[in-house]
């Protein structure tokens, strides 16, 4: 079916395509609005006409005598005699737009159709020059999407908008301009950007014109020269110091983000030499030149929105607490310098040295275990806990009709009749809750949980085992659940009598007052049963139950996450304990290895290879040296020069009575182990020959038995030298 477009006939076409139950629901919803707008009352009358209830529609249209569009509807669709002719009123397009807005709120038409209706209304009012065009524009701005927000021709002049300005309490010193209509005779509508014959680049040739309704809000702080495209020299500008607590208005001609990056990258203290205006142009560099502004009307901004602050602003504030700031306003880069502008906008802002800390190596598990703050953070949940309104698509119904499988048509009729009698938002078990593929008992529980009243449709078919279980389940739920008392209502329809019911069903429900459709006061009983206060109380109870269920699910998920974190923490603690045990074992092995080195024979040494470091005498941890570095200028080893006399020195034995002999141990007892190289001890030798540097010494002689003992007690050879040779002890 073709869409007739946004008109009264199109609105009637939308209503005519709806189902009857949907129209009935919309009729009750619009009729319950006591203080509704004129358009909602007109839409209510149109719904009555779509339902075929012409009498009620005429009564509703009669109450809208002052509405010209309502009179047009009454003349064309309700066959009512009106004083006015069938011509269309001037505000017809606006009323049609409001009607489509109500239909879009009920999801009866797409939002694009509503926007099209407002576009037609804006075009009509603009062509007529109606004084209500501004009010219509504001309404379209609030209700429509961003596609048509603006002038109907596609452009809109600049004007002061009170909604975009901050309240006067934010900055009492700032002046405001009063809004006024555009009265400039030479004002022209805006047009798209287009290239000109100028050789200047587009980036430096863009200009911002002055608004005809908004005057300059602040004065200039310095002398702004013309553009660099002109040949006139620029005047010297000195950066003005601003207190830290104040905020100075900045120009719009330079993007705030780029200006912030330049201020971070340049030094904080910049001295500008004072020169004459004639020498300012050739002396001043491009980086310190004053920013170029438009020749026509430079516009300054007096306030900065707190919501539109870039991330660099917070970084600058944190750095400003550590660095002394001498100037709140950094030197600006001229717009005409394309190369410097591209470099500045593309390069990231320079960070202060305090923020560029060198990365550190991660701590070892032992050091991490010593500080509680270094434990790993608990893993974040991959499935975040959402609100119940986002996870559940169930809605609340004022009543639900529980019925047998053979009574679906009767249940639908009962629901429509109850809605006609003023009980909105009803449902049937087969229509809303009996989802294919789901368990029957689960569907029954959902129907009871998500409804205020449970209506049991008593027919001859309602006598099977499943129906009896439904009765028992509904009764037990009303008795055990808080706030569910008197919520189970047996209903006897016109299609059945009490004699046709099963004895079991009658026995279970004999203690409850029934709702009999055969009764002449059936409508009054329905009104007394389903009161607005009761329905509202049931809705509040349902919301609380859903919130409690959501909180319970969240608590279960959080408990599972807590157990997961506890398991990870226990595993980490066990790992730390095993690491400490392994480290203690390594320490023991190191001590034993050091002892074995101290008990071994000395190894010869040569230049560039140091002796192995023995362990500590008390059994401490051995310290292993690093590998020696090769010397830059190796020196040959120094050997002792032989004596000048040809005969080797004699070895006189000390007398037996000498007190020094008591300090040497006996030959039978082993020498004590000391750290370092051990002395060379020779026993029972008659001749000893030593050779150093191709020289040989010898000593022979017979010794008495007493001398032999004395010789065994006195060591003949001393400890090894640094070159690994035995040291000969000579008498003094």
From Swiss-Prot:
Molecular function terms, GO-annotated: protein kinase binding; signaling adaptor activity
Biased composition (Pro residues): 604-615, 625-657
Phosphoserine PTM sites in chain numbering: 209
Motif (pLxIS motif): 206-209
InterPro entries on file: RHIM, TCAM1/2, TICAM1, TIR_dom, Toll_tir_struct_dom_sf, TRIF_N
GO cellular component: autophagosome; cytosol; early endosome; endosome membrane; mitochondrion; ripoptosome
Modification(s) after translation: Phosphorylated by TBK1. Following activation, phosphorylated by TBK1 at Ser-209 in the pLxIS motif. The phosphorylated pLxIS motif constitutes an IRF3-binding motif, leading to recruitment of the transcription factor IRF3 to induce type-I interferons and other cytokines. Polyubiquitinated at Lys-228 by TRIM38 with 'Lys-48'-linked chains, leading to proteasomal degradation. Polyubiquitinated with 'Lys-6'- and 'Lys-33'-linked chains in a TRIM8-dependent manner; ubiquitination disrupts the interaction with TBK1 and subsequent interferon production.
Region ranges (Sufficient to induce apoptosis): 514-713
Cross-link (Glycyl lysine isopeptide (Lys-Gly) (interchain with G-Cter in ubiquitin)): 228
Pfam families from the UniProt entry: RHIM (PF12721), TRIF-NTD (PF17798)
Matching SUPFAM superfamilies: Toll/Interleukin receptor TIR domain
Biased composition (Polar residues): 159-178, 305-331
UniProt note: phenotype after gene disruption: Mice are viable but exhibit abnormalities of the innate immune system.
Keywords per UniProt: Antiviral defense, Apoptosis, Cytoplasm, Cytoplasmic vesicle, Immunity, Inflammatory response, Innate immunity, Isopeptide bond, Mitochondrion, Phosphoprotein, Ubl conjugation
Comp. bias intervals (Low complexity): 345-359, 658-671
Keyword match Mitochondrion: yes
Protein localization: Cytoplasm, Cytosol; Cytoplasmic vesicle, Autophagosome; Mitochondrion
Ranges for region TRIF-NTD: 1-153
Assembly information from the UniProt record: Homodimer. Found in a multi-helicase-TICAM1 complex at least composed of DHX36, DDX1, DDX21 and TICAM1; this complex exists in resting cells with or without poly(I:C) RNA ligand stimulation. Interacts (via TIR domain) with DDX21 (via C-terminus). Interacts (via TIR domain) with DHX36 (via C-terminus). Interacts with AZI2 and IRF7. Interacts (when phosphorylated) with IRF3; following activation and phosphorylation on the pLxIS motif by TBK1, recruits IRF3. Interacts with TICAM2 in TLR4 recruitment. Interaction with PIAS4 inhibits the TICAM1-induced NF-kappa-B, IRF and IFNB1 activation.
UniProt-recorded name of the protein: TIR domain-containing adapter molecule 1
Protein's organism: Mus musculus
UniProt gene name: Ticam1
